[in-house]
C-alpha cells in the first residue's frame, strides 16, 4: 500500500476477504437449509436436481470469488478497477442466488434474506452499490 491511500481503500482491502467468505458461507448455509428441508420433508418442492444445481452454483461462486479476490489484491497492490468489478459480481451473485433459492424452495418468506445480503454489501461503504441493491 502506498502512503497516500485513503482510509476507505485500506478498510476495503482489509474487509474484502471477510465479505467474500461470509457471502460464500451464507450461500453454503442456504444449501444446508435446502438439504435439511428435503431430507426432513418440510418442503416437498425441493428436488435432488435442485440440490445439485444449487451446489454447482455455490462452487462457481467460490471460484469466481477467488478470482476476484486475487485480481483485486494481487501483487500486494489494491486494484480499484478490479474492486469495482468485484462489487458488481457480488451484486449479481446476490440477486442470482436469491432468485435461485426462490425457484428451488418455493417459500413465501425468502424475501427476507435479501436484506441480509444488502447489509453485507454495505460493508464496502459504497452508497451507489447499496442504492442499486435496494432499487433492484
Q: Which role fits each region the language model picked out?
A:
Residues 118-129:
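Short helix-perturbing small/polar motifs within transmembrane alpha-helices
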Residues 1-12:
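Short, Lys/Arg-rich, polar N-terminal cytosolic tail immediately upstream
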Residues 15:
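Glycan-recognition and catalytic regions of carbohydrate-active enzymes
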Residues 27-106, 113-119:
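Hydrophobic transmembrane alpha-helices and their membrane-interface boundaries in multi-pass
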Residues 18-25:
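Select subsegments of transmembrane alpha-helices in polytopic membrane proteins
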Residues 129-136:
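Central hydrophobic cores of alpha-helical transmembrane segments
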Amino acid at each position: 500500500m502506498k502512503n497516500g491511500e485513503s482510509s476507505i481503500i485500506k478498510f476495503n482491502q482489509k474487509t474484502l476477504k471477510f465479505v467474500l467468505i461470509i457471502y460464500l458461507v451464507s450461500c453454503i448455509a442456504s444449501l444446508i437449509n435446502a438439504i435439511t428441508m428435503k431430507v426432513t420433508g418440510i418442503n416437498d418442492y425441493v428436488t435432488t436436481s435442485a440440490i445439485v444445481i444449487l451446489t454447482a452454483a455455490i462452487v462457481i461462486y467460490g471460484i469466481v470469488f477467488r478470482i476476484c479476490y486475487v485480481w483485486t489484491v494481487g501483487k500486494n497492490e489494491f486494484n480499484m478497477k478490479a474492486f469495482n468489478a468485484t462489487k458488481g459480481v457480488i451484486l449479481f451473485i446476490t440477486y442470482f442466488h436469491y432468485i435461485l433459492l426462490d425457484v428451488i424452495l418455493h417459500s413465501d418468506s425468502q424475501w427476507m434474506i435479501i436484506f441480509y445480503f444488502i447489509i453485507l454489501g454495505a460493508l464496502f461503504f459504497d452508497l451507489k452499490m447499496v442504492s442499486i441493491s435496494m432499487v433492484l
